[in-house]
UniProtKB/Swiss-Prot annotation:
Short name of one Pfam family: Sterol_MT_C
TM segment ranges: 17-37
Source taxon at top rank: Eukaryota
Recorded family membership: Belongs to the class I-like SAM-binding methyltransferase superfamily. Erg6/SMT family.
Keywords recorded for this protein, A-Z: Endoplasmic reticulum, Lipid biosynthesis, Lipid metabolism, Membrane, Methyltransferase, Microsome, S-adenosyl-L-methionine, Transferase, Transmembrane, Transmembrane helix
Gene: TMT-3
GO CC list: endoplasmic reticulum; membrane
Major site of localization recorded for this protein: membrane
GO MF terms held by the record: S-adenosylmethionine-dependent methyltransferase activity
Function: Converts botryococcene to mono- and dimethyl derivatives, but not to tri- and tetramethylated products. Unable to methylate cycloartenol, zymosterol or lanosterol, but can also use squalene as substrate.
Location of the protein in the cell: Microsome membrane
Annotated protein name in UniProt: Botryococcene C-methyltransferase
């Protein structure tokens, strides 16, 4: 995580460190020093410190209980595939997940909670912004159009789309803490009036029928109990002829549910991201068509660039250098010393294992977080 922090400000330096044998030692010094000196008051900042992870959506003293409930929410099918025990708790599970992880994501990854290609000569942050800005092109946006960001998180994709198109973007997220973060970032970006976050369930949206000119979702609808649940709501609030573009987390044609290693990999991705399950790319296509959309484009963007570094290149480097193991040790130590909430290390262990399995899923080409679907509501 120390290298993630540095990467936000000096990605070139981090890439150099990752080719140097002393990277782990330097990371240790930076991380442990940062833990000690970062005990700041719980105020809103553009980028949370490590210790402010504890002051996100869960009170310090409640973390152990919340983490235990989170893990207990899952069971397994006869094939060993992970599923949520009670479908009625899927929405609250996603809310709990983002209570626990929002600060961590912002600290270690950035305010765009998604993956992207890394094109030659482009930094990580620039690649993320390029990935977000493509949505404006996919949707054929024009200034003043009313656009819906489905599952907006803390709002970086929505702000990017608004900034590069002049459209007015409304984002919806289930999580109250993410609304606070989104409002802060939007004010700092000077985009008040162009991006507005709204708290709500994207499977039961508080918007009028036919009220949006376009809609998009970026790595978010994977949290829906069923894709039809969220797709039908998007269909309802779109005007006739409007476009809906979404990046879906799906299994590819190479996934084999009878392969124990494939199942283990997917289970870790599900648990480590608060998902109900992982659908196939074909199921995602059919879900859109089932609610009335016309399917215009279906493309795995993870495989479309012959020169870009893969979406999993950042966690892959960290796995190759053993940095996730180092991170786990730092978090366990900080938790033991009560610099982080007791038992919080258990959740970070889940995340570290998930990151390693994201890399495997990408390397084995059984999973993609970048399957692009573009739908159109009939006129």
């Amino acid at each position: 995580m120390a290298l993630d922090l540095l990467s936000s400000y000096a990605p070139g330096l981090v890439e150099s460190l990752l080719t140097w044998k002393g990277a782990a030692g330097l990371a240790a010094a930076v991380a442990l020093g940062y833990i000690i000196i970062s005990n700041l008051p719980g105020r809103q900042v553009a980028k949370p410190s490590l210790l402010q992870v504890r002051t996100g959506g869960v009170a310090f003293e409640k973390v152990a209980e919340v983490v235990a409930d989170y893990s207990d929410s899952y069971g397994q099918t006869e094939k060993g595939e992970l599923i949520v025990k009670d479908n009625n708790k899927i929405v609250s599970l996603a809310n709990t997940f983002y209570d626990l992880i929002t600060d961590g994501y912002e600290w270690g990854w950035g305010s765009g909670f998604h993956f992207s290609h890394r094109l030659p000569g482009m930094s990580f942050n620039a690649s993320q912004l390029l990935h977000e800005s493509r949505m404006a092109s996919f949707l054929r946006l024009k200034p003043g159009m009313q656009v819906l960001d489905v599952g907006c998180g803390v709002g970086n994709p929505g702000r990017t789309v608004a900034a590069c198109s002049g459209a007015v973007v409304t984002g919806i997220t289930i999580n109250a803490y993410q609304i606070k973060r989104a409002e802060l970032h939007t004010k700092r970006a000077g985009l008040v009036g162009y991006f507005k976050p709204v708290q709500g369930n994207f499977c039961a949206m508080p918007f009028q029928d036919k009220s949006f000119d376009a809609a998009f979702a970026m790595d978010s609808t994977c949290h829906a109990p069923k894709l039809e649940d969220v797709y039908s709501e998007v269909f309802r609030v779109l005007k006739p002829g409007a476009y809906f573009a979404t990046y879906e987390w799906v299994s590819t044609k190479n996934y084999d549910s009878n392969n124990p290693e494939h199942v283990k990999c997917m289970n870790s991705i599900i648990l480590g991201n608060g998902l109900p399950n992982i659908r196939s790319w074909k199921q995602a296509e059919e879900a859109g068509k089932n609610v009335g959309f016309n399917l215009l484009t279906s493309l795995d963007m993870a495989t479309n660039s012959p020169i870009g570094k893969p979406w999993y290149s950042v966690p892959e480097r960290m796995v190759n250098w053993g940095l996730f193991r180092f991170h786990k040790a730092c978090i366990r130590t900080a938790s033991t010393l009560h610099l982080l909430p007791p038992e919080s290390w258990k959740f970070f262990y889940i995340l570290a294992e998930m990151a390693e399995n994201l890399v495997k899923g990408g390397q084995w080409d059984i999973f993609t977080p970048m399957h692009l679907l573009i739908f159109q509501k009939p006129e």
